[in-house]
Amino acid sequence: MAVPKRKTSPSRRNMRRSHHALGANSFIEDKDTGELRRPHHVDLKTGMYNGKQILTPKED
């Protein structure tokens, strides 16, 4: 079994974890409805994606 020969310093540990941060979600304004939605995702209110009807719209 592999065992570390030296203790990992907090600086090295934090440098290794520097790429683990979560980024903020991006939103775009929908051309048809004007609502905000995630890019490359289906609009859940209308059920449209890329100009095509994918899902049946939710009834409110």
Curated annotation (Swiss-Prot):
One of its GO terms (molecular function) is structural constituent of ribosome. GO terms for cellular component: large ribosomal subunit. The keyword Ribonucleoprotein applies. Residues 28-44 have a biased composition (Basic and acidic residues). Residues 1-20 have a biased composition (Basic residues). InterPro entries: Ribosomal_bL32, Ribosomal_bL32_bact, Ribosomal_zn-bd. Pfam families: Ribosomal_L32p. The keyword Transferase does not apply. Gene3D superfamilies: Single helix bin. This is Large ribosomal subunit protein bL32. It comes from Caulobacter vibrioides (strain NA1000 / CB15N). The gene is rpmF.
